[in-house]
Amino acid sequence: MQLENIKKLQDLDVKGKTVLVRVDYNVPLKDGKVDNNKRIVASEKTVKYLLDNNCKVVLMSHLGRPKGKVASEFSLAPVATEVANVFGVKVHFASDCIGEPAAKTIAEAKNGEIVLLENLRFHPEEEKNDETFAAQLAKNGEVFVQEAFGTVHRAHASTSAVTKFLNGGIGYLVQKEVQFLGDALAKPNRPFAAIIGGAKVSDKIMVLNTLLSKVNVLVIGGGMAYTFLKAQGYTTGKSLLEEDKVEEANKILATAKEKGVEILLPVDHVCSTEFSNESPVMTTENANIPEGQMGLDIGPKTIALFDKKLLECKTIFWNGPVGVFEMSNFEKGSFAIASSMVEATKLGATTIIGGGDSLNVLKKAKIKTDLLSHCSTGGGASMEFVEGKELPGLTALAK
C-alpha cells in the first residue's frame, strides 16, 4: 500500500475548521469506566495537532458489537470522560452520531474543544457502508481524518463511503502504522524473522504464504504448530489439529525449502491431559507428543532455540501467542518470545507486533510497549496489510 496518493494530516487545510476524525476507541470498559486507555492515547498526536490548529474536533468511533441496535452497555459516554482526562479540554458528548443530536452538540462546542459522537454501530447502516448514512456523518465536519488503523480493513460508512462526501487524509497514527509495516516488508534489515502463532493454520495460510517471499526465518508456534509437526511425521497426541490442513502445511514447508527460508517449529512441548490450568503438567523430551496429552505451550528447549535465532535477526514481526498464555502454566513460551523481542530491540533490531493477542501477552507479562519498535493497534488490519490485501479505509482516500 503506497501513501503517495493519500493526503496526510499535515497536508490538509484544517485551521479553525470543524474536523471529523474516525478514531478507534473500541476500548475495554469495567464498572462503567475505561479499563485501558491505550487506544485513546494512541490518537493523541493527531487530536493535539487539531486542537493546536484551533479546530473543533469531532470524534467518531465504534465500541463492541451492538449489531445495529442501541444498547446502553456499548455507549461511548464513559469514553468521553476518559477523552477529557487524556486531552485536558472540554469534551461534549452527542447522544447520536447523526441528525439533530449530533448537529446541536457540535454547534454548542467551541473551537479548541472536542465532540465525541455516540457509537457508530448503533446504526446497521454503518457496517453496510451505506452512502445515505455516510452523507449524514459527513455533515458533522468540513474535513475528514482517518485515524483508526484498526478498522481500515473494513469497508464501513465511517471509513469508506464518508470519503465520497468529505475530502480528507490520514492522521499520524495511521501514517506510522503504514510506514512501519510497509518499510518492514518492503526493505527490511536482514535477517528478517516472522513469528506466527495462534490456534489455526486456516486463519494464517495467506499470511504465511506472503511471508515466505519476504522473510529469512519463519518461526511457527501456538496451536497451528501441531498441524505442521503432524505433516513432518511427529505424533501430536490429542493436541489441536487441523487434519484437513496437513497437506497445506506440507506445501508451505516445501515452498520454504525452495525459497531458502529457515522454518523453526517447537522441539519440545509443555503438555497436559486437559485444557485446564488445574490438570497435571508434563514437558516432552522431543517434538513428539504422547497419546492422551495435548501441547499447550512450547518447552524450554524450544524457548532457547527461538531466543538464539531471534537475537541474530535485524527485523522481527510477531503475530499470535505460542501457547495458551491466558493460563499461568502455559504462559512461559509467549512471555519468552516477548522478552526476546525486547532484547533484540536493545541490540538494534526493528521489532514489530502485529496487534491482537500478542499485545495481551505484553500486558500480562507487564512489558511496556515502548520497549519494542512498534506495536500495531490493528490486529486484523495489520495482518491484511502484511498479506498485501487492499485496505478499503485507505484506498477510499487515494484520490
Curated annotation (Swiss-Prot):
Its EC number is 2.7.2.3. This is Phosphoglycerate kinase. GO terms for biological process: gluconeogenesis; glycolytic process. GO terms for molecular function: ADP binding; ATP binding; phosphoglycerate kinase activity. GO terms for cellular component: cytosol. The keyword Kinase applies. ATP binds at residues 204, 295, 326, 355-358. It is found in: Cytoplasm. Its main location: cytoplasm. Monomer. InterPro entries: Phosphoglycerate_kinase, Phosphoglycerate_kinase_CS, Phosphoglycerate_kinase_N, Phosphoglycerate_kinase_sf. The keyword Calcium does not apply. Keywords: ATP-binding, Cytoplasm, Glycolysis, Kinase, Nucleotide-binding, Transferase. It comes from Elusimicrobium minutum (strain Pei191).
